[in-house]
Amino acid sequence: MERWQVEFFKDEKGTEPVKNWLDGLSNEVRGKVLARIDLLAEHGPALDFPFTSQIEGRLREMRLRFGKTRYRILYFFDDSRSGILLHGFSKDTATVEEADKKIGRARMTAHVDRKAPAKKRKK
């Protein structure tokens, strides 16, 4: 089975927010999250609940629970067969806050817009 590419979203300054979020986690939690990312690369969009779930449209969440804390990474698959990791966060409740969804949507749009070919000008 061919592995899927998994990439960290980069903002306009070249910052990788999910990578920065991972750096702030304990070694134990980071290892578990990285293992889950590897599972996503292995299975691609076929990886489903309880490991991932759909948020809305193409936006999905990678799910991991460690102790009482839920860790999430919002991501989507772009047209080049790459999983793009958009936003990482932890939470204590079962729902994803609208503010986190908004960040995920904005970063997904920014990624798609950056990758879209420039429109040819009419002469």
Give residue spans per PLM region.
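Basic, Lys/Arg-enriched alpha-helical interface segments
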Residues: 1-70, 79-83, 90-123
